Amino acid sequence: AGRTVFTGYRTSSKLTFQKDTKSTYQITQEFSAADLSEKRYYTNGVTVPNSINAATPDCTTDVTEHSFQRIRLGYGNTTDDVKLSIDGKELTPGTDYTVYKSVSDFDPSKLSADDTAYIQETGEFVFGKNVAASIKDNDKKLSVTYVKTGFDSSDARPEYYYNCKDITNAVTLDAGGNVPHDAAGDIIYSDPSKVVDFKFSSQEIKYTVANSTDITVNTQAKDVMDTGIKRDVDELIDVVQNAVNAHDKVSQIKK
């Protein structure tokens, strides 16, 4: 009773967070060139004016579409503590890529072919055309290590999908709610003994049913679903909401 079949050996644990939590995890995800996907970004959104300036009566703007390759992390709303490595070489934030807190801070029209951007809100790296081409043409491997504080109810627990560390009780967040770092960029632990290190591994539970015959009786979450499912739903909701907002603006303009 009360056992789960998606959580490996931890059959008494839940796959998802059961309530909103302020837990802090350091998570590492591995990607290949095949994980890059296309996403469209838009600029020059329409703002409905409160009044018309007689000198410039034409308030129309041309919405511009920008298409880039990106990788999406398992979670959005991460901290700015994110490290990207390509083929084992760690890139430097501020030099090799720019970190933006929200989508509204990111201007896709200014992302050059040789630039890379990271958006904390959506948890995605956006690659300029030359960078993306280099990754794909050379089948490069990418690794991202990032910190996330705060998970919603129903979010998948990272330990069932990734190599990660639960550092909730091992660090003291600063006034801004961020994990403190030293000059070298390493996390400052207030109590290192309280770091819970999860090394992701296959955890099949097998029963012996006959001589030299075993059967696997559990299914692990990673084999049937990934954290991208919830991210896909979130993006779909955003698209629908943007469409609703667009229709509302048209209605206001027609009034």
Could you describe each region identified by the protein language model?
Residues 1-255:
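S/T-rich, low-complexity, solvent-exposed segments of bacterial secretion/appendage proteins
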